[in-house]
Amino acid sequence: SSSAPAVTYAASGDSEMGTAVADYALQFVGNPYVYGGSSLTNGTDCSGFVMSVYANFGVSLPHSSSADRSQGSAVDGLANAQAGDLVCYSGHVALYIGNGQIVHASTAKTGIIVSNADYKKVLAVRRIF
């Protein structure tokens, strides 16, 4: 990896692709939440957000937060999460960006935001890259 300083959320040890996924996802913060949507600019729900972000990297994920829990490989909890990992909750899915934080299409009221990853009980962490 390059020694040039970079402004990023990712910590060392994160995969380059995972970091790229997190950085790409972060540019959509502030955009709207729309149930059933998958547009990163005009409105998406939680799984549509994850699906559309990963589609940019050539990865096809289901438009379903529960189905996302079986994608990729299992990660042993938030303590071992890396940038780009899927963080799965009951009825919800988010992207881990590092430093204990996630980016996600949260609610119609908030839209796409950054939150603490432990804001509710984590069911699974899944690594795609």
PLM segments and residue spans:
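Intrinsically disordered, low-complexity
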Residues: 1-32, 121-129
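Residue-identity detector for threonine
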Residues: 8, 19, 41-44, 73, ...
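Catalytic cysteine-centered active-site loop
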Residues: 11, 24-83
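...with weaker cross-activation on analogous glycine-rich loops/strands in unrelated enzymes
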Residues: 51, 59-118, 129
